[in-house]
């Protein structure tokens, strides 16, 4: 479950830091448009698709990696790596994107599936000798994952601080709009659409 995964990640981060040259990457993978698969094909098909995706994810990982399904269509992965060979993690992430994107045939139904993936590394989030805990890594990887979705899905991105600022701005903007609508602070204005041939009013925008 999620708690045992978090505990295992915290242990992995501490042990990696002791070596001085190793760190941990937290990878979040979200299956794109999974709700549509459930809605159109039923929960049984959706569950089998998740099982297939879990198999594909595991097949791309080194044996010591930690894997957990932490949400309806979200998987979390923790991988220890050599800090001087971070490119290997890029290779894993690219393999995950490619493996998940293979069409799946379930209950005689062909399903096109992709994933949005976000990554965060423990060494880049350490502050003043304090290591990030699993919750922080999950949060940062989650932010990077949603950035991937906004960039068109079926891709992966490493967490960068501006992503958090952008998400915070979006959340504050959405909250402000919802509050404004409830208070009646928005006044709509409509521009007339005129047929240039006849001069008649045809609509508004």
Outline where the language-model segments fall.
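Conserved long alpha-helical elements within nucleotide-processing catalytic cores of c-di-GMP signaling
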Residues: 1-25, 32-62, 68-72, 76-77, ...
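Structural alpha-helical segments in enzyme catalytic/regulatory domains
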Residues: 14, 95, 172-185, 200-202
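Short beta-strand edge/capping elements of PAS-family sensory modules
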Residues: 23, 135, 154, 202-205
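Short, conserved catalytic or interaction motifs in soluble domains
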Residues: 39, 80-81, 150, 161
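Short helix/loop segment flanking the catalytic signature motif in cyclic-nucleotide metabolism enzymes
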Residues: 48-49, 76-98, 110-111, 119, ...
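Cyclic nucleotide signaling catalytic output domains
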Residues: 67, 95, 99, 109, ...
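PAS and PAS-like sensory/regulatory domains
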Residues: 111-115, 186, 204
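A short, well-structured catalytic beta-strand-centered motif of the EAL phosphodiesterase domain
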Residues: 190-205
């Amino acid at each position: 479950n999620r708690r045992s995964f978090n505990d295992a990640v915290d242990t992995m981060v501490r042990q990696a830091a002791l070596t001085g040259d190793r760190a941990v990457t937290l990878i979040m993978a979200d299956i794109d448009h999974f709700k549509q698969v459930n809605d159109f094909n039923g929960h049984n098909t959706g569950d089998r698709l998740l099982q297939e995706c879990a198999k594909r994810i595991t097949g791309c990982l080194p044996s010591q990696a930690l894997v957990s399904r932490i949400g309806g269509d979200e998987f979390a992965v923790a991988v220890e790596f050599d800090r001087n060979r971070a490119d290997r993690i890029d290779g894993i992430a690219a393999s995950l994107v490619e493996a998940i994107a293979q069409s799946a045939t379930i209950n005689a139904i062909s399903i096109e599936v992709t994933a949005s993936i976000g990554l965060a590394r423990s060494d880049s989030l350490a502050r003043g000798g304090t290591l990030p805990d699993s919750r922080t890594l999950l949060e940062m990887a989650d932010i990077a994952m949603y950035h991937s979705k906004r960039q068109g899905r079926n891709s992966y991105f490493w967490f960068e601080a501006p992503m958090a600022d952008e998400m915070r701005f979006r959340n504050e903007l959405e909250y402000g709009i919802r509050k404004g609508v409830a208070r009646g602070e928005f006044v709509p204005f409509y521009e007339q659409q005129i047929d240039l041939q006849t001069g008649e009013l045809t609509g508004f925008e």
